């Protein structure tokens, strides 16, 4: 009755990405840049207004509900908060058995053995399968979430900031587990984070997002060691250095102002209000993501 139109938000705008089997693609950017929306769009949890999502030749954006459900066997997600992503009323056994039963990939007689195998894969003892989420630590809960994502043996896993809610010591364990699973199972992993210090340890390539667009894409080492855009340089400068003497003397890049509103984005390059190198052309022209060097794209 009182609904009114206040504007249109392009949370993800013109993004083109591909992920190969066995590859880890790191997706980084400031909070609110569209990383999580992109992840949900890939999974078709959020409807697309344009473009396509293709998984092994199948266009998910034009598929019906039944086909999307079938495709999700090959496309799974690990959410950010292990305290919210697990049903508190379901035991670990129920949580891991549910996708197996829904998709009919395992007979009831084999469910117990399959759940035990999944728990061992992520470093948990099968004797805990009748426990509830509140009986586990944050790191253990995230291992359960990873096991649930692995239950259907997917081709692609999207991990949306899977370690940001965990202690630093636990973060390393989860990162090592994900890297081990990628190698062992030949998974494709899209690893989303806002912290480049985390992403650089696990990614083969890194894509940098700003206000819904991919602005820099390349091999992880190249992006970290030779960032081309000011927004990427600012993210790299925020990576802490273990040596306190170096940390005290190194220059930290702080971008002026706040990210523009996606409801009313600036004209031209969306970064120009905060860019120290902005010129008049930046206010009028949207820079396309284009090849800059071998295996490197820059907007």
Regions found by a protein language model. Give the residues of each.
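Charged, flexible cofactor/metal-binding loops and thiol motifs
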Residues: 1-5, 219-299
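ABC transporter nucleotide-binding domains
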Residues: 1-226, 237, 297
């Amino acid at each position: 009755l009182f609904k009114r139109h206040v504007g249109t938000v392009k949370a993800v705008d013109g993004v083109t990405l591909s992920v190969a089997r066995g590859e880890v693609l790191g997706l980084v950017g400031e909070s609110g840049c569209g990383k999580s929306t992109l992840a949900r769009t890939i999974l078709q949890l959020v409807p697309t207004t344009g473009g396509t999502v293709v998984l092994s030749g199948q266009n998910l954006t034009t598929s019906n509900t039944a086909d999307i459900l079938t495709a999700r066997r090959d496309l799974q997600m690990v959410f950010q908060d292990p305290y919210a992503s697990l049903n508190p009323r379901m035991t670990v056994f129920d949580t891991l058995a549910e996708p197996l039963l829904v998709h009919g990939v395992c007979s009831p007689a084999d469910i117990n053995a399959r759940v035990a195998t999944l728990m061992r894969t992520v470093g948990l003892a099968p004797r805990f399968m009748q426990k509830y989420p509140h009986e586990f630590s944050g790191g253990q809960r995230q291992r359960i979430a990873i096991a649930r994502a692995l239950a259907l043996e997917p081709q692609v896993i999207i991990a949306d900031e899977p370690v940001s809610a965990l202690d630093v010591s636990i973060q390393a364990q989860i990162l090592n587990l994900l890297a081990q699973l990628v190698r062992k199972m030949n998974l494709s992993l899209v690893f989303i984070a806002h912290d480049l210090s985390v992403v650089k340890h696990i990614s083969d390539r890194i894509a940098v997002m700003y206000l819904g667009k991919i602005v820099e894409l390349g091999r992880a080492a190249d992006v970290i060691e030779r960032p081309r855009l000011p927004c990427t340089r600012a993210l790299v400068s925020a990576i802490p250095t273990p040596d306190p003497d170096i940390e005290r003397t190194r220059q930290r890049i702080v971008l002026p102002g706040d990210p523009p509103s996606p409801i009313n984005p600036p004209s031209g390059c969306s970064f120009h209000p905060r860019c120290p190198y902005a010129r008049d052309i930046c206010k009028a022209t949207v820079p396309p993501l284009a090849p800059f060097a071998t295996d490197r794209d820059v907007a």
